[in-house]
Amino acid sequence: VDFASESXNKRENQQIVDKHNAL
C-alpha cells in the first residue's frame, strides 16, 4: 500500500464531501 497516495486520496475524497455538503 502506498501511504502517500492513500492520504492524497483521502484528502481528495474529503474535498468532494465538503463540496456536496456546501450545496
UniProtKB/Swiss-Prot annotation:
Keywords: Disulfide bond, Secreted, Toxin. Expressed by the venom gland. Coiled coil: none annotated. GO terms for biological process: defense response. GO terms for molecular function: toxin activity. Residues 8-23 have a biased composition (Basic and acidic residues). It is found in: Secreted. It comes from the Eukaryota. Disulfide bonds: none annotated. Not toxic when administered to cockroaches at doses up to 5 nmol/g. This is Cysteine-rich venom protein 24. It comes from Naja kaouthia (Monocled cobra).
